[in-house]
Curated annotation (Swiss-Prot):
This is Zinc finger protein 568. Residues 18-29, 226-251, 296-312, 329-341 have a biased composition (Basic and acidic residues). Residues 34-105, 124-195 form the KRAB domain. Belongs to the krueppel C2H2-type zinc-finger protein family. It comes from Mus musculus (Mouse). The keyword Iron does not apply.
Length: 671
């Protein structure tokens, strides 16, 4: 992967810099020959065998494209052996003896220090080489990519510190050293990290562009300085650009430090980077910045990168990357760079992208009325209505409407869960899932209904609840007339009538309707009880069980039967009780015809016919037909008597025993 990161970094450098640099150098200084060896990456047999087919295809495409770029600008005359091999679809690792690039990490760091810092030690700062991520970008990175980013940033800061070029420690370095997520810095410094590229390139006065071109020419007059800057940028950004390799072999550019250049140079570099694509047109027509991939790739990456459109000129920018973040070059004075930053961040001609405006959502779905910031977001949403799912998982065959959803699904097969809960140890694939899970422990319910004041942990729960107020379409079961607010809930309910249980437990073979029910059941085998009562310390497998138990301490019974006035601690108990009044007993025994209110009661009854007693006491070997009976029996061995009479202090194993005992004090006879 390190070789692949080098290659991806060199691909971006060659595509962006080879042609414009040659044009500028022709006017200002004698050309310096760049050979294929200067930008090629050779692989050993071991490295080649470790690469996946998609990575090999990416390597082949990049090497051939790099060679094509060098031939175009006249920097390569003879065709290297590795190109012959790649064109004939042969493995290129046979050229192991010609390895010449980055023989060791120590040598690479030595070159970086000697070239990148030799002639610009006076002006180079950490801000010139740092790379920032937003929260959305940070969540797109895998765990290994985040470790790579952390190592590169700390290594850069260490190099600057050894050369006495760092005065104070930046906040992003402090966060990385503490093991915290560095995207938090974005909240306070957004304007500095994301200056508006449009206000600079679309200047009304053409003399500003001409002045910028003249400055570019002056910067290229010093070969040593420019060469050192180029090498320094490549060394710093090489590994990070390689981490965003698209799984179909496409390269998604990571957030990199951009070089200021006029539109004419930018368009030339864009044409060379993507041969065969549409050339950039004039100022009045639609233009696309360098941060965008080719048209085919861009369509595949819209789910990962939110595009924002410029209102006046139709320019499209990738808001998920930081390619537009402009850092001052070391040759410029601090005063000039600060002036440019302030002009780009809040100048009079600045036009903010629409996605940044937040409230404006001009693109509306005709099916459901939902609005979006960009046409690409609307396009992805419309796939849900038409049922289009072009992205298919090769492991299980499941299809998804966007590539981002497919990437997240792949973690199910790899079992990659990087975000762990400190309370119960449960791991999640996304930080947003972890934040939602932590609300179970904290009891936080931030989503409140304005109609009735009821609060919910998740926005999805609130959305379903709002349907009850709005009188929206309701889904009714034809077998028992039970009504649900969405079709998915009805589908799960209908499995209780058909007896279908597709999710099987590997430990005991028990089947369940949904995977969430299976996960709850598996805690029976592990003995895990993550939900603890703060009053008595008792543990529970589910948060709902804990909430129900806590009402026993408070005496709260908010659910009341309208028929007899009896109160209950939860809605399920109320629903079960109401069947006593209605006489509804939908679960019938096939052996004797006896009917039951609950399905669990039918299951326990069927064991009386079969004689099955699956619950065995480990102390005395006695077996029971129900788990609750086993739990009661085990209290005999432990001596636990949790039900205590407040009148005389006598304790009992069961609550029913306490109820019978209390009649002695009240003088009430049992019916």
């Amino acid at each position: 992967m390190e070789r692949l990161s080098q290659m991806a970094g060199r691909r971006a450098w060659c595509a962006e810099d080879s042609v414009p640099r040659q044009e500028e150098e022709d006017r200002t200084r004698p050309s310096k020959t760049v050979t294929f060896k200067d930008v090629a990456v050779d692989l050993t047999q071991e490295e080649w065998q470790q690469m996946k087919p998609a990575q090999r295809a990416l390597y082949r495409d990049v090497m051939l494209e790099t060679y094509s770029n060098l031939v175009t600008v006249g920097c390569q005359v003879t065709k290297p052996d590795v190109i012959f091999k790649l064109e004939q679809a042969e493995e290129p690792w046979v050229l192991e003896e010609e390895m010449f690039w980055r023989r060791s990490p120590e040598a690479a760091r030595g070159r970086m220090k000697s070239f990148a810092f030799k002639d610009m030690a006076k002006d180079l700062r950490f801000e010139d080489v740092v790379i920032y991520f937003s929260l959305e970008e940070w969540e797109c990175l895998r765990h290994s990519h985040r470790n790579l980013y952390r190592a590169v940033m700390l290594d850069n800061y260490s190099n600057l510190l050894s050369l006495s070029l760092a005065d104070t420690k930046p906040r992003v370095v402090s966060l990385l050293e503490q093991g915290k997520e560095p995207w938090m810095v974005m909240r306070n410094e957004t304007k500095i990290w994301h200056p508006d590229w449009v206000s600079r390139t679309e200047a009304k006065d053409s003399s500003k562009i001409k002045t910028l071109q003249e400055k570019m020419a002056k910067k290229h007059t010093c070969p040593t300085l420019e060469d050192s800057k180029t090498r320094g940028d490549r060394e710093v950004t090489r590994e990070l650009e390689g981490q965003q390799v698209h799984q179909e072999g496409h390269l998604r550019q990571a957030a990199v430090t951009s070089v200021e250049r006029p539109d004419s140079v930018q368009c030339t570099a864009h044409r060379e980077a993507h041969p065969g694509g549409k050339p950039c047109s004039s100022e009045k027509s639609q233009k696309t910045s360098l941060c965008q991939p080719p048209p085919i790739e861009r369509e595949q990456l819209h789910s990962k990168a939110k595009a924002s459109e410029h209102a006046q000129h139709g320019k499209v920018f990738n808001s998920c990357t930081s390619d537009t973040a402009v850092h001052p070059r070391p040759q410029e004075s601090r005063k000039d760079s600060e002036r440019k930053k302030s002009a780009l961040a809040g100048g009079p001609d600045t036009s903010k992208p629409q996605s940044a405006q937040g409230s404006e959502r001009p693109h509306k779905c005709k099916e459901c009325g939902k609005a979006f910031h960009t046409p690409s977001q609307l396009s992805h949403h419309q796939k849900l209505h038409v049922g289009e799912k072009p992205y298919k998982c090769q492991e299980c065959g499941k299809a998804f409407p966007s590539n981002a959803q497919l990437s997240l699904h792949h973690r199910v097969h790899t079992d990659e869960k990087c975000f762990e809960c400190k309370e119960c140890g449960k791991a999640f694939m996304r930080p947003s899932h972890l934040l939602r899970h932590q609300r179970i422990h904290t009891g936080e319910k931030p989503h409140k209904c304005k109609e009735c004041g009821k609060a919910f942990r998740y926005d999805t729960q609130l959305s379903l609840h709002l349907l009850t107020h709005a009188g929206a379409r309701r889904f009714e079961c034809k077998d028992c007339d039970k009504v649900y607010s969405c079709a998915s809930q009805l589908a799960l309910h209908q499995m209780s009538h058909t007896g279908e249980k597709p999710h099987k437990c590997k430990e005991c073979g028990k089947g369940f309707i949904s995977d969430s029910h299976l996960l709850r059941h598996q805690s029976v085998h592990t003995g895990e009880t993550p939900y603890k009562c703060k009053e008595c310390g008792k543990g529970f497998r589910r948060g709902s069980e804990l909430a129900r138990h806590q009402r026993a301490h408070s005496g709260d019974k908010p659910y009341k039967c309208k028929e007899c006035g009896k109160s209950f601690t939860c809605t399920t108990e109320l629903f079960r009780h109401q069947k006593v009044h209605t006489g509804d007993r939908p679960h019938k025994c096939k052996e004797c015809g006896k009917a039951f209110i609950r399905r669990s009661e039918l299951t326990h009854h069927e064991r009386s016919h079969s004689g099955e007693k699956p619950y065995e006491c480990k102390e005395c070997g006695k077996t029971f037909g129900r788990g609750s009976e086993l739990s009661r029996h085990q209290k005999i061995h432990t001596g636990e008597k949790p039900y205590k009479c407040q009148q005389c202090g006598k304790a009992f194993i069961r609550g029913s025993h306490l109820t019978q005992h209390q009649r002695i004090h009240t003088g009430r006879r049992s019916e």
